[in-house]
Amino acid sequence: MPAKKKTTRRNTKKELQKKAATRKMIAFFVGLLLILFALARLGIVGILLYNIVRLFIGSLAIILLLLVAAIMILSVFRKQFLKENKRIIPAIILTFIGLMFVFQIRLHQGLNETFHLIWSDLTAGRVIHFVGSGLIGAIITEPAKALFSVIGVYIIAAVLWLVAIYLMIPGLFPKMREDLHQRLAKWKEKRAEKVEAKKAVKALKKLEEEKEIPEPQTILPEAENSLFTSAPVEIPINIPEAPFEENENPVLEENPVDDEPVNFMNTNNYNGNYKLPTIDLLAEVPVKNQSGERENVRKNIGILEETFKSFGIGANVESAVVGPSITKYEIKLATGTKVSRVVNLSDDLALALAAKDIRIEAPIPGKSLVGVEIPNAEVAMVGFREMWEAGKTNPSKLLEIPLGKSLDGGIRTFDLTRMPHLLVAGSTGSGKSVAVNGIITSILMKALPSQVKFLMVDPKMVELSVYNDIPHLLIPVVTNPRKASRALQKVVDQMEERYELFSRYGVRNIAGYNEKVQRYNAESDEKMLELPLIVVIVDELADLMMVASKEVEDAIIRLGQKARAAGIHMILATQRPSVDVISGLIKANVPSRIAFAVSSGTDSRTILDTNGAEKLLGRGDMLFKPIDENHPVRLQGAFLSDDDVEAVVTFIKDQSEAQYDESFDPGEVDENQVGTGASNTGSGDPLFEEARNMVIIAQKASTAQLQRALKVGFNRASDLMNELEAQGIVGPAKGTTPRKVLVSPDGEFIGGVEE
């Protein structure tokens, strides 16, 4: 009987061990299965489990789950591994704590915000937000950050990782220390060798110099009075002094004013009594309270993320920047998401946000983010006085102008001398005229009349007429389109004359010439005036192109190519940005552009070579694309009232009267003369003048010749030939022979001469 009881107890023990092992294996597989569900976020259970883990350790959940799975597998299949490597678990714990510090610092949120982020994902059954290291991370990080600052927390994390590395690889640091000592010893040896080598070289050079000293002492006295020694003595003295004394000052003295076509000697020097307008002349614009936009931003962030999710796009709103008229949301796309998918959703996003219109910047230059620009419910007006005070332009840069306020609240300025020409386009009511007035007013508030001159063209006769009679004007504001084309040609002539002047004095640009004049005035009693900068402003380019397109285009192209060094800059404005107004040659020579609100993407591409201006809101909302940037920048232009402009102009007029330069006077024009525009009375074909000049120079005319030279069809060439005959330029047709040209290259009529 005792033997049977003993056997029964042994069998019961083995069965208990088997049952325990079975329970362990079941628990192992169930736990591993749940971990896999959580890692893959499969279904409601997987997302719920993952979010529960995230509640405590945040976005480190995936790392913790993988570590737990690895430890479970090792504990079942390699039990001795953990016993043999007891330092692994403490090392893993220290590494994990360091990661918790770093992840929570990256979140930039406290305990309450972290809990709300995780709880929103947990209740919504989703995994979207980056939540740092969860509640545990927030609990341990916030006190550490308060005690040691953010940098201190990073240092603590780095120390924990170093300790973890030491625990896992005990021999690593001693080995590194030995290697460092060996390398340091080798470096010291090499340095000592180099020092010894340098000392030896210096000693050898010293010995050689001591040996060579007697030789020059015996040669120099013999050659002291020779031609060979006298030349080197004279050359160093004469080279720096002779060109300046003999060439520079006499050039300025020997060239009288009469030899220089335009030297602006008829322009008074206003530097003595003239005072610049002060900021007190401008009215203050009350600051708009945009506190309500913060609530709108929070609401829009949720709408954006939900909309992206509904279209199957993984995207998070990283940040939002509230500007004067729009708010820019910076979107982080999931890896593998095409940017074009977001761009194509612009209408759907506008519908979801109930926005007037939105603009998508994909991607934001310099960032791996996509920008979504949404209009604000409350638009904050930017005052010109506020912008001028905050812009803080350099007083020595006369053409540095504050343009508008960017999204981050900074004032964007531009230097017209670097642009060097500017094209401004926008539909009626977009803020184009206000921007042009702001540019003019900015220059008037910085520059003396002797420093900057304006030539203004205003075919509409109402935009720039307020500036008449200011001393900065070269001539009164030009309102006749035909006179405007002549005035532009006068500016081209002035540019050529300035280049001749630069060539005569050996300078490259207006800055070099004015610097020479300043040096001359400092050394001579006879004073010369510096050349002023010239700013040509055309308020409506379309009107000029309709009347005299070829002359205007030629003048703009020539000024665009060469005028920068001569100190001449253009600002061309139009409210009809079509290709017949802004031609390809004009765009190529006017590289800096400002686009206000336009009606279509075609107009936007005409101005900026890209879409976007059709999405602008108007009232000063603009896209600025300077010459040195590849992407346009969105700005809110400043509001400048008519009263402010009138106050500045009146202040200037009260100090001095305008003294116009007759050399820029376009003179009288015949309103019925034949031009090259679309509305010419002599010919309806814009190629008529080109055809006329061609046949007069060639002294022969045929329809086939016009076809080849002008690249037009037979019908158009035939019409041109008939028009030339009607104008008395060519004779009648005589079979297949070319027509006779009745005007000589000198312009004389030779119709009566028969060969």
Curated annotation (Swiss-Prot):
Residues 660-685 are annotated as: Disordered. GO terms for cellular component: plasma membrane. The chain crosses the membrane at residues 28-48, 56-76, 88-108, 128-148, 150-170. Residues 660-671 have a biased composition (Acidic residues). Keywords: ATP-binding, Cell cycle, Cell division, Cell membrane, Chromosome partition, DNA-binding, Membrane, Nucleotide-binding, Transmembrane, Transmembrane helix. One of its GO terms (molecular function) is DNA binding. Gene3D superfamilies: 3.30.980.40, P-loop containing nucleotide triphosphate hydrolases (3.40.50.300), Winged helix-like DNA-binding domain superfamily/Winged helix DNA-binding domain (1.10.10.10). InterPro entries: AAA+_ATPase, FtsK/SpoIIIE/SftA, FtsK_alpha, FtsK_dom, Ftsk_gamma, P-loop_NTPase, WH-like_DNA-bd_sf, WH_DNA-bd_sf. The keyword Transferase does not apply. GO terms for biological process: cell division; chromosome segregation. Residues 408-605 form the FtsK domain. Its main location: membrane. Residues 673-683 have a biased composition (Polar residues). SMART domains: AAA, Ftsk_gamma. Consists of an N-terminal domain, which is sufficient for the localization to the septal ring and is required for cell division, followed by a linker domain, and a C-terminal domain, which forms the translocation motor involved in chromosome segregation. The C-terminal domain can be further subdivided into alpha, beta and gamma subdomains. The alpha and beta subdomains form the DNA pump, and the gamma subdomain is a regulatory subdomain. The DNA motor and the gamma subdomain are both required to activate XerS recombinase. Homohexamer. Forms a ring that surrounds DNA. PANTHER family: DNA TRANSLOCASE FTSK, SPORULATION PROTEIN RELATED. Belongs to the FtsK/SpoIIIE/SftA family. This is DNA translocase FtsK. It comes from Lactococcus lactis subsp. cremoris (strain MG1363).
